[in-house]
Amino acid sequence: MDGDADAVKSGRHGSGQACQICGDGVGTTAEGDVFAACDVCGFPVCRPCYEYERKDGTQACPQCKTKYKRHKGSPAIRGEEGEDTDADDVSDYNYPASGSADQKQKIADRMRSWRMNAGGGGDVGRPKYDSGEIGLTKYDSGEIPRGYIPSVTNSQISGEIPGASPDHHMMSPTGNIGKRAPFPYVNHSPNPSREFSGSIGNVAWKERVDGWKLKQDKGAIPMTNGTSIAPSEGRGVGDIDASTDYNMEDALLNDETRQPLSRKVPLPSSRINPYRMVIVLRLVVLSIFLHYRITNPVRNAYPLWLLSVICEIWFALSWILDQFPKWFPINRETYLDRLALRYDREGEPSQLAAVDIFVSTVDPMKEPPLVTANTVLSILAVDYPVDKVSCYVSDDGAAMLTFDALAETSEFARKWVPFVKKYNIEPRAPEWYFSQKIDYLKDKVHPSFVKDRRAMKREYEEFKVRINGLVAKAQKVPEEGWIMQDGTPWPGNNTRDHPGMIQVFLGHSGGLDTEGNELPRLVYVSREKRPGFQHHKKAGAMNALVRVSAVLTNGQYMLNLDCDHYINNSKALREAMCFLMDPNLGRSVCYVQFPQRFDGIDRNDRYANRNTVFFDINLRGLDGIQGPVYVGTGCVFNRTALYGYEPPIKQKKKGSFLSSLCGGRKKASKSKKKSSDKKKSNKHVDSAVPVFNLEDIEEGVEGAGFDDEKSLLMSQMSLEKRFGQSAAFVASTLMEYGGVPQSATPESLLKEAIHVISCGYEDKTEWGTEIGWIYGSVTEDILTGFKMHARGWRSIYCMPKRPAFKGSAPINLSDRLNQVLRWALGSVEILFSRHCPIWYGYGGRLKFLERFAYINTTIYPLTSIPLLIYCVLPAICLLTGKFIIPEISNFASIWFISLFISIFATGILEMRWSGVGIDEWWRNEQFWVIGGISAHLFAVFQGLLKVLAGIDTNFTVTSKASDEDGDFAELYMFKWTTLLIPPTTILIINLVGVVAGISYAINSGYQSWGPLFGKLFFAFWVIVHLYPFLKGLMGRQNRTPTIVVVWAILLASIFSLLWVRIDPFTTRVTGPDTQTCGINC
């Protein structure tokens, strides 16, 4: 450490550093310090190269691509004259001012770190350490400085958890763990003896700099792109450049590793611009239409008119909240080859970040073990370094069936994983792979593939039989409870009162596959449950997995999957890493969300289960603002973001009016520039949005510290108050790049893991309020994502060509409505909570249109009330003979026609840029009405009962069972529920209204047919939207199509009423009145 300090000091006041562009000395500033062009990565660039790049180049650092800030003494360039810049504050992030000693030290450390990494391949900008360089710091001797908080960074994952054989079932506490000793902390000591090696960077860029320097010295000298001032004749790409002693091919490869790992792909202007124009036109037409409706009441039907106008105003507001977050849709591309070049070169240890994958399950009767097993198998076979993947299965029902099924799965994985990796098959869930109706021999050239596939299919069928046997055995619970293989009672016999359980099935020492290769870790977790403790359902289970994984493996990133969502694209994790590990983008990304795709849905998607309008339109629109909302599964998280920390704060630049709509913030005035960085950070965040910054902890370590052990203890207590009473877990939160300390033993880690899943661990901590999955709603996903966005994080929407994950969806009408009811109930709970996006987090860093989207996500169930009224109005109008619209003139009819045209045009152009089919769009419109007048309506009243009266509703797990009685047998199964009553009632009264309206028109003559057409159109609009519901209500019709039955009943009713009206058997004779004329008339 002392040697490092001396090296830094000598480097700060020396000028021996070479510019990595031209080879000249970097030089010093006016104060005598080493000139640092980029304060983010410390890439050595001399002053002339820096000035050229700002004036004529890309204005960004060649290594990290961060835009250069103007240094003291540098002339302003075009675009900077009107900006509120500070030449002294050259950082793009809130570091201390450049003149301070802390900043100088940070710059020197960054430049020294770059020296150690230059020329070493991937992981640019991150310090690398030899395995023997990890040791305790000098503070171990007892010298504890003031403000010192022990922290660990960049630790390698070690202290592997041994896998257990099937006879070692679990580890559960046999008694009180007792007083836990302080967890050993380690720190890194970089090796200062590593040789400095430069990098040529971009060759063409270097040549432009050389020409610019000559032009500055000798006047204007013409240059041509790609031509050096002093070219070497006959030199090819593979020749040696004498000025740098570097091979050109290596230089080009090195330049490739510096390229971004992903990029935004804006939509073509020919598609997005007409779409935006139609939105604006529709807004104008809608305003004129509402003005006309308000100023032209219907005198003889005033109540009906008033109700309709209120509903139409609400629909307009709802449309605005839904439409404008789709103003900036984008696509994204990833470069997996660049990711491999930078972090996963062949023949070298992989530098990819570790990922902990969470699978959650509750009830094995509703979530079949075979479905969960397929999900786990697809995870274990993912295309990612095995030592970087850990799979944690949360069994919140403490079912022995789930435990035994995982034991069987771990054994079958030893055969399945090498098979799929050998032949590179997709998908890697065996159930779905073997059920594919495709040519499985396509692109397969290995002579033994057919034989191996046949043998593997037989192995899988035997595996299915064993799982089915476990399920059959579990149907009848013994009176004395379940007994394990060793004769001891199963600890989870009482699902509401049992200890925490952890079992490691696979891992470093948990056995190898059939080819002798290591398998990813597979860990079974069942958190402790006791009566009288609030367990917070799925959110509580996910937070328990976060803590267990942090103690055992501490992957830098986490993937959350439902038990029925398997990995369909084995490169899904690499796709996510293209964003999360990108040096420019990754540091501000809280999660990468993938779209949900589904198997087993009927061809017509009767109940809009695919939900492509939401996943392919709405979320792509949000990706252009601050990122998509978290949808509960298929999401890769940055662990730091889940811990409640804030992202690095970027100083906002002045932008256009449209960028301000997206949330751009004005810069602080010059008079406030001299305030501290902490005050600047706090300006962005409301008091209701607590923010914890890792930089604050680092400053506490570096600054004036504590004088005694009592002050150090107070600092540790503040962290334990936030994260809980676990020294091991608190230490893991300070490891920026994940990993567990090498000195930790598997036994101590397992004991600590049992402790962090105890039912009382979260008491008096910030779990569920500021850290982890947020409590307070059954849709914890929306709330969790909203909290992270409010802190300033952004999310990414990744849509690879091959869907990353696939799952199952309820195709039965009743199950689908119950699923929608749960989602809507969660939104209502958020709406009436303190986290309501209408008022929560103002003054923070949530962008304006992103807030629009969250408001729409929570307020949409309320639309069910005006929608229900609007669906009843047609029948009332037909039965009473009145209408909600007065007689309109030809001029007024133009606005009605224009409104309908703009509605259809918006939909058509939306489908055009998104690729969503018209059938999918129409199914979404239909189910919006079906769900609105049933599930959403019930959710509003249940939410009000919960908030006002404290009456809680039970959370029901959506069944994931597959069809066993034929294809889509569940689609036609009739399951009665109270959710079916409102749509059924509306259907009947509208059909009766149609019959009554036609009869009335016949009775009144041809003069009544004109007003009738408007009423009939109104009624048929409701009936057509409810047609899928009507089909589901009638079930399977083996002989007569449903549409025939409906029209038969409708036409029979009309003709019956006509028959009664005409009464053809009654003789009607026209003549004089017999009473007047008498008998002789």
Curated annotation (Swiss-Prot):
Binds 2 Zn(2+) ions per subunit. Keywords: Cell membrane, Cell wall biogenesis/degradation, Cellulose biosynthesis, Coiled coil, Glycoprotein, Glycosyltransferase, Manganese, Membrane, Metal-binding, Transferase, Transmembrane, Transmembrane helix, Zinc, Zinc-finger. Residues 103-112 have a biased composition (Basic and acidic residues). A zinc finger (RING-type) spans 19-65. The keyword Nucleotidyltransferase does not apply. Its EC number is 2.4.1.12. Zn(2+) 1 binds at residues 19, 22, 46, 49. One of its GO terms (molecular function) is cellulose synthase (UDP-forming) activity. This is Probable cellulose synthase A catalytic subunit 8 [UDP-forming].
